[in-house]
């Protein structure tokens, strides 16, 4: 109890240094939670929106994957007619995926609205309605909120003006939809498609349909996957650079915590020469001195962790309110991981100053008094 009072008194006696240390550790925790949450948020949002399309099987041209082959229209849209004639197939919807880079990277879906809605049900319109003409477009509610657009406004997509005919609820693949025929014309790809979404009469027949498509002459090299298998590939281990990037973020954050605590505790030890000398002259052991300094470090770390978690949660709310398209996942597991990382980094930074304090000779420590 006496030691705890002394530790708290030391922190209160130097409020600015204590506050700076807490803020630095909070920065470390916030950095980890926001960046990791952003990475997982982008991945999981993409995964959820693909699941929301409602397809059971996804057919892509040869060499495609969930990361590649998503732009342009490399194959004939008539493949949809071939697949549609197969047993157990109820709906086939050809779609053009086109990457646009204006104002950020995004995917535009060129759709046949009737077959696309047959996959997972009609679009849920927040306002407006379906395409009324070839130059109409649908956007989801997140795009509408962030870009501050409404039904009837004109939006430029792929350097072409489109009238927004409807705003739909998010979660159905892309965030912008245009008529497939219009996108084919803009790309000079008449009668072409990028991907085929297939609906099956019974989930038990999904594997049979996958095998049937792969066995179709001329389609042996196509990528044919059940939606479940397709989505299961969207994991950190399958995303190039995902894990190394997270590792770098954690490493940089840990170094920040280590250096700040090292500097703060080392300086504090140098300033407490007299106090340490008195404690040792009264019989305090080396273990007692080390224990006191590590407890002080632990209190700073706990304060920084609590502040960092609170700041990250508030920042997440603020970011998603200001930029609805930015998704930041909140994970209790990563909160625990960030707390452990902060404590380990802070403790590592305090070990050398703590042992240096424990080695001080009481006579030398009091020599200038």
Question: Where in the sequence are the language-model features?
Answer:
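Hydrophobic secondary-structure segments that place a key small or acidic residue at a functional site
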Residues: 95-96, 104-114, 124-182, 192
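Hydrophobic alpha-helical transmembrane segments of multi-pass inner-membrane transport and secretion
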Residues: 15-42, 239-278, 298-307, 348
């Amino acid at each position: 109890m006496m030691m705890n009072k002394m530790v708290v008194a030391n922190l209160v006696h130097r409020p600015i240094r204590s506050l700076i240390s807490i803020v630095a550790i909070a920065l470390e925790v916030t950095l980890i939670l926001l960046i990791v949450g952003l990475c997982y948020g982008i991945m999981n949002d993409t995964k959820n929106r693909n699941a929301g399309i409602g397809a059971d099987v996804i057919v892509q041209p040869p060499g495609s994957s969930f990361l590649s082959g998503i732009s342009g229209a490399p194959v004939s849209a008539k493949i949809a007619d071939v697949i549609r004639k197969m047993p157990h197939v109820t709906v086939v919807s050809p779609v053009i995926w086109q990457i646009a880079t204006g104002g950020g990277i995004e995917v535009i879906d060129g759709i046949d609205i009737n077959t696309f809605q047959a996959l997972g049900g009609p679009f849920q319109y927040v306002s407006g309605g379906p395409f009324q003409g070839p130059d109409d477009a649908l956007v989801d509610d997140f795009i509408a909120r962030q870009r501050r657009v409404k039904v009837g406004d004109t939006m430029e997509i792929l350097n072409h003006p489109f009238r927004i005919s409807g705003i739909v609820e998010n979660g159905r693949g892309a965030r912008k939809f245009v008529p497939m025929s219009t996108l084919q014309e803009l790309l000079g790809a008449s009668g072409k498609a990028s991907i085929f979404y297939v609906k099956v009469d019974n989930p038990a027949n999904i594997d049979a349909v996958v095998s049937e498509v792969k066995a179709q002459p001329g389609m042996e090299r196509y990528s044919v996957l059940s939606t479940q298998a397709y989505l299961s590939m969207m994991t950190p281990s399958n995303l190039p650079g995902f894990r190394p990037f997270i590792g770098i973020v954690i490493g940089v954050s840990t170094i920040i915590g280590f250096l700040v605590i090292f500097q703060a505790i080392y300086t504090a030890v140098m300033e407490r020469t007299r106090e340490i000398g008195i404690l040792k002259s009264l019989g305090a052991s080396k273990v007692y001195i080390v224990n006191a300094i590590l407890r002080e470090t632990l209190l700073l770390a706990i304060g920084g962790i609590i502040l960092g978690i609170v700041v990250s949660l508030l920042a997440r709310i603020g970011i998603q309110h200001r930029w609805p398209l930015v998704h930041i996942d909140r994970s209790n597991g990563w909160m625990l991981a960030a707390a452990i990382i902060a404590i380990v980094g802070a403790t590592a930074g305090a070990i050398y100053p703590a042992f240096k304090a424990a080695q001080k000779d009481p006579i030398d420590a009091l020599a200038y008094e």
